[in-house]
Each structure stands twice: as structure tokens, then as C-alpha cells.
């Protein structure tokens, strides 16, 4: 992949795709191809086929997805499964059909079994039942990953897959009903402080353990792997550090200046009890995350206050 390669970033308006575009631009890549949803509906196979036939991208970063937190996944599992399956299969198939030299597919750590060994190695994929709260999304992501693997197996396509941990950062969604836990907590504590509320109620017990990766670190890892990895196995991307959701809530409350009480509603689900990635493969390849959670949280809050995140407030 050189500076004049024609590179298509699917999902460039999302957090992950936007970070990949910024990383490509920062490293001097000059021919980055993007399309908005209005210009190209990735769920429509005919549109995707025409786009690839006309543009002929040499490299593809497949970052497009319909995403959401526990509530959003529970409310619309059929939509999550259908939309993600369609946009994944359409892009991956067209990339193969029209001679794309290499594709990177962005999976998710939620594809691992609910009771997977911790930290979770890549080999434990499909070794047990999925977490019910995001099963539809996970099934779609597994299908995309497997399609890349089968195209490699049957046709020799250099299509690789990565599994990032929970992401946050510039361009995240702060939608009150559909966002993931970290941006949801930023919004909730910010608004509670502004309104002078005495307490904030959070879902679950606060005991679930999670790992968080800043989106710009993910982008750097994706560019690194696009250049240096052509293996058959998917690769985990994370920080190797975890904390409880309760600890995360306390960090965010302190950051925004909320001094009230945090109350946990245990009638609401926690999701998977623990989710930490085994990064042995990634570290052996020579890449490690740079941005710690304590460094990344203020950047995410600044995005919520002044950046693209303002659009969903």
C-alpha cells in the first residue's frame, strides 16, 4: 500500500472509519475514496457493485456497521442482523469480484462466547454460546469474518479480519438511547451536573469488566496490519487493561465535575461479565496501543462538548 494507492474507507462518517481516514491523511495517502450513505447505500447490492466497478479501489478498510449499546440491540435485533449482514457481504463480495488487492474487515470483541476464557484468544471464536444481549450483531460480524476467510481459502483473496475491543473517541455516538456505555456515561453525568441532579442512575451492577481502546489507536493498528499482516487468523486489537463499569462511571463523574451519588439499577442487564482480549498475536507482530484511558477520556469529553459528538446531544 503506497501513497498513491486507491483506498476506500467504508463507513468514514463513523467513529472507526473517521479515525482510519485521519490516520491515512496524516501519513500522506493521497487517494482516499469515501461515500456518504446518501451517495451509496451499502445495503443495496446493485449500488455497491456499480461503485466498485467504477472506482476500482485497490485497498478497502471495511469499517461500516450499524452499532449500538445493549438497549439498541435488544430493541431491534432483526435490523441489526439484516443491515450488518447486507452491508458486510455486499462490500466484501464486490471487493473480491472487482480485484481489490487487500481488504481489512473490522469485526468486534462481542463475537466471542459469553463464557470465553479471559483474556480471550482468537482461537476461542465459536467455542460456546454468544451473549444474548448482542447476539444478532455478533452473528453478523462472525459472518463477515468467515466470508473473508472463505474467500482466502477458496480464491486466495488477501482479506484479513481484526477484532477490536470496546471503542471510544472522536466521532462517537452520544445518542441517549442507542450509544455504548462510555459515551452514554459521559452524556449522563454531564447533563446531571448541568441540571444540578443529586444522583445518576446507571444500568446493571457496575461490576462488569471492560477494556476500552481509543479510536485513533485502532486506526493506527489497522494501518499497521494492512501493511504487515496477511495471515489467515483474525487479530485482536486492544490495550490489555480492564476496569469495572463502576470504576469507569466514577472516573467520568470526576472528570465532568459531578459530585452527586451514583446508583446502580441491578434490574437492568450487565451484558457479558468480563471482556478482555488476549493480545499475544498483536504484540508479537510489533504493535501496542499508545493512548491510555486516563489520556483518552478528556479527549472524548472534548469531542462531546465541541466536536462531531455535539450532533447527537
Where are these regions (language model features)?
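Hydrophobic positions on the long internal alpha-helix
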Residues: 87, 91, 95, 147-148, ...
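Conserved Rossmann-fold NAD(P)-dependent oxidoreductase catalytic core, especially the SDR/UDP-sugar
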Residues: 89-134
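Conserved beta-loop-beta element that borders a ligand/cofactor-binding pocket
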Residues: 102, 107-108, 145-170, 183-186, ...
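Flexible, glycine-rich beta-alpha linker
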Residues: 111-113, 136, 160-184, 208-209
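Active-site helix of classical SDR
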Residues: 136, 140-143
Amino acid at each position: 500500500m503506497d501513497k498513491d494507492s486507491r483506498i476506500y474507507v467504508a463507513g468514514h462518517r463513523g467513529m472507526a472509519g473517521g479515525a482510519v481516514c485521519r490516520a491515512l491523511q496524516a501519513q500522506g495517502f493521497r487517494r482516499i475514496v469515501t461515500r456518504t450513505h446518501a451517495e451509496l447505500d451499502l445495503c443495496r447490492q446493485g449500488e455497491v457493485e456499480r461503485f466498485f466497478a467504477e472506482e476500482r479501489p485497490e485497498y478497502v478498510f471495511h469499517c461500516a456497521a450499524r452499532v449500538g449499546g445493549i438497549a439498541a440491540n435488544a430493541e431491534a435485533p432483526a435490523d441489526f442482523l439484516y443491515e450488518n449482514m447486507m452491508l458486510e457481504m455486499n462490500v466484501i463480495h464486490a471487493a473480491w469480484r472487482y480485484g481489490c488487492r487487500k481488504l481489512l474487515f473490522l469485526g468486534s470483541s462481542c463475537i466471542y462466547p459469553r463464557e470465553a476464557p479471559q483474556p480471550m484468544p482468537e482461537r476461542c471464536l465459536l467455542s460456546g454460546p454468544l451473549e444474548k444481549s448482542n447476539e444478532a450483531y455478533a452473528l453478523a460480524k462472525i459472518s463477515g469474518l468467515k466470508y473473508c476467510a472463505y474467500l482466502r481459502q477458496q480464491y486466495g483473496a488477501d482479506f484479513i479480519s481484526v477484532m477490536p475491543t470496546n471503542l471510544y473517541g472522536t466521532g462517537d455516538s452520544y445518542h441517549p438511547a442507542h450509544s455504548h456505555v462510555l459515551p452514554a456515561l459521559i452524556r449522563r453525568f454531564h447533563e446531571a451536573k448541568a441540571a444540578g441532579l443529586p444522583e445518576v442512575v446507571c444500568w446493571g451492577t457496575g461490576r462488569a469488566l471492560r477494556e476500552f481502546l481509543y479510536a485513533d489507536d485502532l486506526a493506527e493498528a489497522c494501518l499497521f496490519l494492512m501493511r504487515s499482516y496477511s495471515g489467515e487468523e483474525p487479530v485482536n486489537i486492544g490495550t490489555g487493561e480492564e476496569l469495572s463499569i463502576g470504576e469507569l462511571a466514577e472516573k467520568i463523574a470526576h472528570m465532568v465535575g459531578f459530585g452527586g451519588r451514583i446508583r446502580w439499577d441491578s434490574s437492568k442487564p450487565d451484558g457479558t461479565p468480563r471482556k478482555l482480549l488476549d493480545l499475544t498475536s498483536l504484540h508479537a507482530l510489533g504493535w501496542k496501543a499508545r493512548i491510555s484511558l486516563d489520556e483518552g477520556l478528556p479527549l472524548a469529553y472534548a469531542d462531546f462538548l465541541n466536536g462531531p459528538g455535539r450532533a447527537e446531544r
